[in-house]
Amino acid sequence: MGRSLKKGPYCSPKLLARIEEMNEKDQKRVVKTWSRRSTIFPQMIGHTIAVYDGRKHVPVYVTEEMVGHKLGEFAPTRTYRGHGHHTERSTALK
């Protein structure tokens, strides 16, 4: 279930303030955030935001197509390494 339309999209006030400040000063530096739930706003286009995935901060460069999505969508929390493979030892046991 998504967020109610009457409430509008959510973005962390601290993150939004940092982005606005960087836009005013015309700066481009990486902004670290733990707020995966924040919606990407048009003001964020062109900035790199380091989103925490539970282990490290993943740099996400914001493009126009990302507006309206959540930051967490672009920093996966789980890495799938595949199922176990057959080895010489495991096939010899049969």
From Swiss-Prot:
It comes from the Bacteria. GO terms for biological process: ribosomal small subunit assembly; translation. GO terms for molecular function: rRNA binding; structural constituent of ribosome. Gene3D superfamilies: 30s Ribosomal Protein S19, Chain A. Protein S19 forms a complex with S13 that binds strongly to the 16S ribosomal RNA. HAMAP family: Ribosomal_uS19. This is Small ribosomal subunit protein uS19. It comes from Desulforudis audaxviator (strain MP104C). The gene is rpsS.
